[in-house]
Regions:
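Contiguous, often N-terminal, cationic amphipathic patches that form binding interfaces
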Residues: 1-81, 86, 102-120
């Protein structure tokens, strides 16, 4: 279930958990994202059974070796939510392409909640 790349003189294997770590880091790098949502996205059938799921996110490697991402976040109420979603999509795609060398088919950002400071 790992991502394999043939390179002379051997193979480079990227575990699905590495992809979730990259997605988590790219998502949390945006100042408008307070944290990942505590829920896990519902399980959907995978085309090849490849991918990984972690708290608030899911990464699937499709049959054509492209990647799809679903990430659920809790946002800062002062953030522009539309801009936050677009920037997080771009950050995730760039990080996966640059760090892991995978082609990204889609990144879906779900803003599940905004969190206000309790002292306000």
């Amino acid at each position: 279930m790992d991502e394999h790349y043939e390179t002379p003189p051997g193979t480079v294997t990227i575990a699905p958990g590495v992809l979730t770590t990259i997605v988590r880091m790219a998502t949390l790098a945006h100042p408008g994202v307070l944290r990942l949502a505590p829920r896990v996205p519902p399980s959907l059938p995978r085309l090849r059974g490849k991918g990984a799921q972690a708290e608030g996110l899911r990464v699937d490697v499709l049959e054509d070796e492209t990647v799809t991402v679903d990430v659920h976040v809790i946002a800062d109420p002062n953030a522009s939510l539309t801009d936050l979603g677009k920037v997080v999509q771009t950050q995730i795609a760039r990080a996966l392409e640059h760090i892991a060398g995978v082609q990204v088919r889609s990144v879906n950002v779900f803003i599940d909640e905004i969190e206000f400071d309790a002292s306000v």
